[in-house]
Each structure stands twice: as structure tokens, then as C-alpha cells.
Swiss-Prot record:
Its main location: cytoplasm. The keyword Ribosomal protein does not apply. Residues 20-98 form the GIY-YIG domain. It is found in: Cytoplasm. This is UvrABC system protein C. One of its GO terms (cellular component) is excinuclease repair complex. The keyword DNA damage applies. It holds the Pfam family GIY-YIG. Interacts with UvrB in an incision complex. Belongs to the UvrC family. CDD domains: GIY-YIG_UvrC_Cho (cd10434). It comes from the Bacteria. The UvrABC repair system catalyzes the recognition and processing of DNA lesions. UvrC both incises the 5' and 3' sides of the lesion. The N-terminal half is responsible for the 3' incision and the C-terminal half is responsible for the 5' incision.
Length: 614
């Protein structure tokens, strides 16, 4: 049915008043939904091509019929337009664009920037000062790299709270994987040199590092510093041994291999990564498509979106030629500030890598489709068991986690017919209730989640699972009734008498109990969702509990607000380090004077509190 209230968009008139400069255009529907983002070498020509009456496929015709307004951004070059286009696609996910969907956080190796740097696996925002190397295809590749770093350069991996409170070396020192900077068994300049060498290695400059170490070994030998020369000799030997084991092909150097497989509207792009000649493994991606894009278009969209966020290697092998390859090369090279090559139809060893990536892409897509089909079957079984007329498009589940009422956290996880939608997970820190009151915690969490949905006209689930029995279900019912939320089917998931998986009872709003049995695919789906909610709640609770225990003793000290509390914990690496410090050491922290340091020390050690003011 046509929406007669929607304004008519005159695409021809809009295009006619555009310039012929390069740029990016955006198409919007009547409700301001972003339909599509595109780039243009000449905006007037490209935008006008949508409205010139020439034949177009069904997807394009459907999109054009929904346009009520457009806007454009002029850029200095087509390469700049390409970068902007893909930044917008990645951040806004327009309905009709191929979009790289990946709700996982890419793992990196982090080398911190501090007096005694540590090396560690890192996920998430780059909030910690330091250098980030990656991304790596998976955690296994990062751990293998860290293992090499500890063996070769003996850098610390411990958290600051542990590092600052060691009185003797730990096991890592005893097994030769750390030089014990915590107790300064290694001089600061020597440790800094190890950090510099590790950075060279992580940058892919192991050949340069080996040559440099050889020169240092020769110099030490000529200076009759034979112990130092022997240490350098052993390090060179370890590096060469590692290279012999790890290098698949010395010519591979820094290289990404990309292959795409498609079946219907489902696509898989597989990344095979080499860094410094080492095979770091594979990582699959499943871009959102509309079913009418070619594999070449999907691969081109992936290349532009992925390498806008992450630094590209010098060479990227593709399993097929892609559109706008020259433009992509120019944009990626400009972004990386060095030459980046895209290659296809390669020979020799590189052809073998492409074949390997292609085969893995096909196998991974087949596995993913089987998994999604099984997930869809479980979702359909849930619909049938609950007697719903329509397919279940969205399921949410709430769970509560706490330790004897401490640090209560509620979780909300979201599933659709294809599986978890992790980007829409939410946690709620529960406050203002009697500790341990799970009913009040559940009601507060439901109220907060759905109040916002009502105020912002957000998406509601078809089925809302509550981890608990009739009591918890009643709290959820009351919260939804207070908000006037209708059309959401509530189901309580109560553990059986023996709390065994497969013996759960499903409590319905009318008081009925369903016991589907362990083999029922609908119950298996519910268990999957419930277990994910449980995991997400526990993770949040543990983090909140740890933070509360670190800061609670400081909150009771007059004159210690959030900023000073954070400074103290950061300086000493935690409450243990702070308690071990004397008044003079505490007074060295920014914002802490002698009187306040004395008060802090007294409070932490149960002494009479000085009356001195700040």
C-alpha cells in the first residue's frame, strides 16, 4: 500500500542542480531511514542515472521508490569520496548497502607506554596508552605471538597491580620468560632495549633486527664483553630458529589473502593473514547483502570497509578482479601513506594461498549456512510450541547476577532467527533495592529497558524470556503493564527440581507450565538464549564487584572524590599497592597533600584519623 502522505521526490530536478565534482550521496526514506550511501566521480551524472528511466534491477527499483530526500557531500577526489562512503556505510549501516557486519572485537598485541612496559593481548577501544599491533585474525595468533615475545625478549605480562607489589620474582622469571623488572633484576636501559627490539619484531622487521643484533654481538666481542656477546648470539639463534619454523614462505612477508564465497544472499569473505612471513591463520566475515550483488561487488565493499579501519599490508591478494581496483589502491595507499598493492591472477606460491583461502571460504560458508538452518529450525519450533501465528523475529532474555546481594547486575541478550545479536546486548547496574532482592532487581531492569523503548519507539521482542519461575515472571508482567507495553509474550524459564539441563519448566503468563523435554529443539533454543544471558550477567557482575571492592574503602574517606580515587588506584596499581605505601609515598600522588595522605593511611590501617584538613 502506498503511503500517500510521503512527499514526492523529484530526483531529476535534484540531480540537475548538482555539480560534476566527486563526492558522496545519501538517500533517505520518509521516516529518515538511511537507504543507501554511494560515491560518485561526478555527482550530477551518478545521481541522475537513478532517475533517467533506464532499466534497473528489482532491488534498485524498490530503493528508488522509497526515496523522499537526498543529500550530498562534495570531496576533493574520487579516492576521498571512496573513503568517506565506506566510513558512512560502516558507521550507519544503510539498508541497501553491502555492509561488513562483525560484532567481535579484533584482538591486538599491546605494548604499553610506561616506565616498565608490558606486553599483552588487547581487545576493545584503544584507551590504554601504548602501541597496538594488529589486528590479528584470532586470539590464537595473538597468543602465539606473545609466547614468542616472552621467549625472545622476556617482557613482563603482569598487570600493574601485581607488578607494583612484587617482592620477589614470579614463576615467569624462573622459567626464563620474564626478566623480573618488578624487582629490578634487569637494569632499566637493558629492559628498554628489549622493548625496542620487540617493537621491531612486531613491525615485521625481524631481518633488520637480526642484522642489528649481529652488529652488536660483534661490537661486544671486540670489546671483550663475552657474556653480552653470548647473550646476543643466543638471541640471534632463537630468532633464526623461530623464522625457520614459522615462515611458510620467506617471500610472503606482510600479506593478506581474501576470497569470497556466496550462496543466495549469504556471503563469506575469508581473510588469510601473513605477517613477517608467518601464517597467522584465517578469519571469516559474513557481510550483509541484498542478494543481488555479485561476488566481485561484495569483495570490493569488504576491502574498502575493512582497510579503512585497519592498516593494510603492502600486498593484498584477491581471488578475483574487483570493480574500482585502481581507485581502491589509490585510496588505501593514501590512507596508509605508503604503496599498497591489490593483486589477482597470481602464480606460484601465492596462487596456492589464494586457492587455500577460496577453499576455506566455501567450507566456512557451508558450515555457517548449516548452523543458521539449524538455528532457524529451532526458532520455528519455538513458534510452534508457543502457538504463535508469525515467525519469531526477536527474542530477549533477562537474568540477574550478584554475590549475596553485592554488585547486582541484570543482563539482556538479544537473539533473532539467525542467532545472537551481540551489538544489542545490554547490562543494567541495579541500585536502590534491598540487597539480594531478585524480584526488585528484575522489575527495575525490565522497567529501564522497556521505558526507553516506549519513549523512543524502539524495537520490542516477540518473546521475552525471564530466567526464573512464576515470581520473576510476575515482576516482569507488572513492569510491562505499568508501561503499557503490549504484544510481548512473556515466558519464565524455571529450573527443574534437580536443576538439570533439559528438565526446565516454561512458565506461561496464564500459569501453565510446559515441559518440552531435553530433545525438543524449542527448548534447546531457549537454553541457548538463557545460558548466554547467564554468562553475560555473570561477566558484568564480576567486573562491577571487583571495581567496588577496589574503591569502597576509599569512598568513606573525607576529601577523596572520584578523581583522586582514580589517581590513587592508578598510581599504586590497586588497593593492595596503596595499603603497602607509606604516607610519604601517598603524598607524591597528584592532588594529595601531606594531611590527606596521613588521613588515607590511617583509614586504610584502622588507625585514629588525623583531624587535619586538606
Amino acid at each position: 500500500m502506498t503511503d500517500v502522505s510521503a512527499p514526492v521526490f523529484d530526483g531529476k530536478a535534484f540531480a540537475a542542480q548538482l555539480s560534476t565534482a566527486p563526492g558522496v550521496y545519501r538517500m533517505y526514506a520518509a521516516d529518515d531511514t538511511l537507504l543507501y550511501v554511494g560515491k560518485a566521480r561526478a555527482l550530477r551524472n551518478r545521481v541522475g542515472s537513478y532517475f533517467n528511466g533506464s532499466p534497473k534491477n528489482a532491488r534498485i527499483m524498490s530503493m528508488i521508490s522509497q526515496i523522499t530526500r537526498m543529500d550530498v557531500t562534495v570531496t576533493r577526489s574520487e579516492a576521498e569520496a571512496l573513503l568517506l562512503e565506506n566510513q558512512l556505510i560502516k558507521s550507519l549501516s544503510p539498508r541497501y548497502n553491502v555492509s561488513l557486519r562483525d560484532d567481535k572485537t579484533y584482538p591486538h598485541v599491546l605494548l604499553t607506554r610506561e616506565d616498565w612496559p608490558r606486553i599483552a593481548l588487547h581487545r576493545g577501544p584503544r584507551a590504554i596508552p601504548g602501541r597496538y599491533f594488529g589486528p590479528y585474525p584470532g586470539v590464537t595468533a595473538v597468543r602465539e605471538t606473545l609466547n614468542l615475545m616472552h621467549k625472545l625478549f622476556k617482557l613482563r605480562s603482569c598487570e600493574d597491580s601485581v607488578f607494583r607489589n612484587r617482592s620477589r620474582p614470579c614463576l615467569q622469571y624462573q622459567i626464563g620468560r620474564c626478566s623480573a623488572p618488578c624487582v629490578e633484576l634487569v637494569p632499566a636501559p637493558e629492559y628498554a632495549e628489549s622493548v625496542r627490539r620487540a617493537a621491531l619484531f612486531l613491525e615485521g622487521k625481524s631481518d633488520e633486527l637480526t642484522r642489528e643484533l649481529g652488529e652488536q654481538m660483534q661490537a661486544a666481542s671486540e670489546a671483550l664483553e663475552f657474556e653480552q656477546a653470548a647473550r646476543l648470539r643466543d638471541l640471534i639463534s632463537s630468532l633464526r630458529s623461530m623464522q625457520t619454523r614459522q615462515y611458510v614462505d620467506g617471500r610472503a612477508a606482510d600479506l593478506d589473502v581474501l576470497a569470497v564465497a556466496m550462496q543466495g544472499s549469504q556471503a563469506c569473505v575469508l581473510l588469510l593473514a601473513f605477517r613477517d612471513g608467518r601464517n597467522l591463520g584465517t578469519r571469516p566475515f559474513f557481510p550483509r547483502t541484498n542478494g543481488e550483488e555479485s561476488p566481485e561487488e561484495v569483495l570490493a565493499a569488504f576491502v574498502s570497509q575493512y582497510y579503512i579501519e585497519f592498516e593494510p599490508p603492502r600486498e593484498i591478494l584477491l581471488d578475483r578482479e574487483i570493480p574500482d581496483a585502481d581507485l581502491l589502491v589509490a585510496a588505501l595507499s593514501a590512507s596508509a601513506e605508503r604503496k599498497v598493492q591489490l593483486k589477482w591472477n597470481v602464480r606460484g606460491e601465492r596462487a596456492g594461498y589464494v586457492e587455500l583461502a577460496s577453499r576455506n571460504a566455501q567450507l566456512t560458508l557451508a558450515t555457517e549456512l548449516n548452523s543458521r538452518n539449524a538455528q532457524h529450525a529451532r526458532s520455528d519450533a519455538l513458534r510452534d510450541m508457543l502457538g504463535l501465528a508469525e515467525p519469531v523475529k526477536r527474542v530477549e532474555c533477562f537474568d540477574i547476577s550478584h554475590t549475596l546481594g553485592e554488585a547486582t547486575v541484570a543482563s539482556c541478550v538479544v537473539f533473532d532467527a539467525a542467532g545472537p545479536v551481540r551489538a544489542q546486548y545490554r547490562r543494567f547496574n541495579i541500585s536502590g533495592i534491598e540487597p539480594g532482592d531478585d524480584y526488585a532487581a528484575m522489575r527495575q531492569a525490565i522497567d529501564r529497558r522497556f521505558r526507553r523503548a516506549v519513549e523512543e519507539q524502539g524495537v520490542l521482542p516477540d518473546v521475552l524470556l525471564i530466567d526464573g519461575g512464576a515470581g520473576q515472571l510476575a515482576q516482569a508482567q507488572a513492569a510491562l503493564a505499568d508501561l503499557g507495553v503490549e504484544g510481548v509474550l512473556l515466558v519464565g524459564v524455571a529450573k527443574g527440581v534437580e536443576r538439570r539441563a533439559g528438565h526446565e519448566a516454561l512458565v506461561m503468563p496464564d500459569g501453565r507450565e510446559l515441559r518440552p523435554g531435553a530433545a525438543n529443539p524449542a527448548l534447546q533454543f531457549i537454553q541457548q538464549v538463557r545460558d548466554e544471558a547467564h554468562r553475560f550477567a555473570i561477566t558484568g557482575h564480576r567486573g562491577r564487584r571487583q571495581k567496588a571492592r577496589m574503591t569502597s574503602k576509599l569512598e568513606d574517606i573525607p576529601g577523596i572524590g572520584p578523581r583522586r580515587r582514580a589517581s590513587l588506584l592508578k598510581h599504586f596499581g590497586g588497593l593492595v599497592g596503596l595499603k603497602a605505601a607509606g604516607e610519604a609515598e601517598i603524598a607524591k600522588v597528584e592532588g594529595i597533600n601531606d594531611a590527606l595522605a596521613a588521613r588515607i593511611y590511617a583509614n586504610l590501617h584502622g588507625l585514629a584519623t588525623p583531624d587535619a584538613a586538606e
